């Protein structure tokens, strides 16, 4: 997947997950125990390392399924000199961060 294809997915919005991957995250644990993502990196499908700065956390919601406990963050980010809205998910039991990009 090229960076242009990633931006096509990001800018189109939608409900169907087109691309998801685990990411290396730098985050802050606040005094109240809440997490705040700061920046992350990931390898795209072409194995190119992409670095992303989190500019602002717009929303955070708790996700609870039968065996899954996670927090989903909607963030304003900067990648490749562009501001992009992204969803990040933190899985509590595995301590893993994931990035989700969507398309209609």
Regions found by a protein language model. Give the residues of each.
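Cysteine-centric segments in proteins
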Residues: 1-104
